[in-house]
Design a protein with these regions (language model features):
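ATP-binding/phosphotransfer module of carbohydrate and carboxylate kinases, centering on a glycine-rich
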Residues: 5, 21-168
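A short acidic/small-residue loop/turn micro-motif
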Residues: 8-15
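A cytosolic small-molecule/anion-sensing beta-strand core signal
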Residues: 1-2
Length: 168
């Protein structure tokens, strides 16, 4: 907030991973942001769509190779995945009025991911155009995290150095 990281009382502010994504299935521990909007789930959906065994070797690189090549099944799964993530970004934006949401992790390096995610996010607003309550709702920018797949490690290091500075 106001240009500073918000850490929260227990230093978990901004940890959106464990937000429940389906109130009707509260007991289902897989219905949270970390499970539904993860690379693991993206690959799970792709395996299912392609009728591959659950243990079929697959990673983000091979998935995006298929998607970038225009494979219909990969693009269908990517649209579904990006819609799920976009809904959560919408919720976060409405709740906190954030300026930007930074997407991290290894797949965040894929231009197709960000393009598809932005398209899904814009589609949410377009699907409710004309609804009175939508008029004043904020919109955020979706950007790649500066440290992509190393974001967690950089965050830990930054927190450590900040804490050490306060001690000196």
């Amino acid at each position: 907030a106001n240009g500073q990281l918000v850490r929260g009382m227990h230093f978990t502010a901004g940890e959106y991973s464990f937000v429940n994504t389906n109130a009707d299935e509260w007991e289902n521990t897989e219905k949270n942001m970390a499970c539904q909007c993860s690379t693991s789930n993206l690959l799970k959906w792709y395996r299912a769509r392609k009728a591959l065994p659950e243990d079929a070797p697959l990673d983000g690189r091979s998935f995006f190779a298929a998607a970038n090549a225009g494979e219909p099944e990969a693009l269908e799964v990517l649209r579904r995945f990006c819609h799920a993530v976009a809904v959560q970004i919408y919720n976060l934006t409405v709740l906190l009025d954030v300026e930007k949401v930074a997407i991290g992790g290894g797949i965040s390096k894929q231009p197709l991911l960000l393009e598809s995610l932005r398209s899904a996010y814009d589609g949410l607003y377009a699907s409710r155009a004309g609804q009175a309550y939508m008029e004043g709702l904020p919109r955020c920018q979706i950007v790649p995290c500066a440290f992509s797949s190393e974001a967690n490690q950089v965050g830990v290091a930054a927190a450590y150095f900040e804490a050490m500075q306060k001690k000196c």
